[in-house]
């Protein structure tokens, strides 16, 4: 599909392209982004070029990964957010916030907007969030966006060649008062 642009009260969410390579490269020099995400480390200019010129457009073109740069109206990059399709109707959300823009709710705002879009326009019925145990900032964003924490997966992610435990949470359309595309029958306890 062709990339879409979403707007919130404070942000413009759009696919990044070659014009954003330098901003992506600069943001990814932050030690916290390198520590808690699976980007290459060290993060080189060619990694940013590959991301903005190949990975992002290819993900949109083959409907496998929908990546949004989070921008202020003036054009400043405040973060990145993507939804990777992992099975029919199920996507996994991932995000990071640029160091100088953290703590202002931008990533949470974007996560809710992209979740609404995924549920209504992409027929997603479940969004999963995962983060390495200890990444309390990512967990706080997910919780503020409405994700339900479901537990800890042992050896649930691979970061820089090392298996690590991760937290997992989910967001369903009903959590945002939206209909699902498929019936959902919760377990009876």
Question: What role is predicted for each listed range?
Answer:
Residues 47, 53-56, 167, 172:
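Juxtamembrane helix-loop transition sites at the ends of transmembrane segments
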Residues 32-54:
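Conserved GNAT-fold acetyl-CoA-binding loop/helix
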Residues 55-69:
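A short helix-loop-beta-strand connector motif used in the catalytic cores of GNAT acetyltransferases and
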Residues 1-32, 67-189:
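Acyl-donor (CoA/ACP) binding surface of acyl/acetyltransferases
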């Amino acid at each position: 599909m062709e990339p879409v642009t979403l707007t919130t009260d404070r942000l413009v969410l759009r696919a990044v392209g070659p014009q954003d390579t330098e901003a992506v490269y600069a943001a990814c020099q932050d030690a916290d982004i390198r520590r808690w995400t699976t980007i290459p480390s060290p993060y080189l200019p060619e990694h940013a070029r590959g991301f903005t010129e190949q990975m992002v457009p290819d993900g949109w073109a083959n409907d496998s990964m929908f990546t949004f740069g989070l921008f202020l109206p003036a054009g400043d990059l405040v973060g990145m957010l993507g939804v990777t399709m992992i099975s029919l109707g199920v996507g996994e959300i991932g995000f990071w916030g640029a160091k100088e823009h953290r703590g202002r709710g931008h990533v949470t705002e974007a996560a809710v907007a992209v979740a609404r879009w995924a549920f209504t326009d992409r027929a997603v019925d479940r969004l999963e969030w995962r983060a390495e145990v200890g990444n309390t900032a990512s967990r706080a964003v997910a919780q503020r966006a409405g994700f339900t924490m479901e537990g800890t997966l042992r050896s649930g992610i691979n970061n820089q060649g090392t298996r690590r435990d991760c937290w997992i949470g989910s967001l369903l359309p009903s959590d945002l008062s939206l209909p699902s595309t498929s019936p959902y029958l919760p377990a009876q306890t």
